[in-house]
Design a protein with these regions (language model features):
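Residues in well-ordered beta-strands of folded domains
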Residues: 26-28, 42, 66, 104, ...
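Solvent-exposed, well-ordered amphipathic alpha-helical segments
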Residues: 62, 79, 101-104
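Small/polar-rich, solvent-exposed N-terminal microdomains that initiate assembly or binding
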Residues: 1-55, 73, 77, 89-97
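Short, solvent-exposed beta-strand/turn "edge" segments of beta-rich domains on protein surfaces
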Residues: 53-56, 112-114
Length: 129
């Protein structure tokens, strides 16, 4: 299972998240005309360290979640649920062993053309390959 697939499965296993967004969590971008609230997720980059023997097998990915809703309050509510699920986590996401998942940034975003509001969260995730 890939890191992003495992992340999606883990986030959507949370009752609060699914009560707010159902299973509307999409790779990279929302579909055309989405039902809100919804989450788009993407890997921004992955850093792999090396030692004298080669790769250390503990990559760190920066993953961005864009949490979209029709109102600021709804975006903030879902963002809080997602952050509560992910921030500070270590353990297993299915077959993926996560050493740490830390929320390292959060910002507000709005789209004046559509009236949508978002909270964008950045996570640094270290896992074992």
């Amino acid at each position: 299972m890939s890191l992003l697939t495992a992340l999606r499965t883990y986030v959507l296993a949370d009752a609060t998240v699914t009560a707010l967004a159902g299973v509307r969590m999409y790779p990279r971008r929302l579909p055309q005309g989405p039902t809100l609230p919804a989450i788009a997720y993407q890997r921004i980059d992955t850093r792999r360290e090396h030692d004298m023997d080669g790769p250390d097998g503990l990559p760190r990915a920066r993953v961005q979640l864009s949490i979209w809703a029709a109102s600021v309050a709804a975006a903030e509510e879902l963002a809080a649920a997602v952050r509560g699920r992910l921030d500070g986590y270590k353990g297993a996401w299915g077959s993926v062993t996560v050493g740490s998942c830390l929320c390292v940034g959060e910002r507000d975003l709005d789209d004046p053309e559509t009236g949508r509001n978002a909270v964008v969260q950045d996570y640094m995730i270290q896992w074992r390959e």
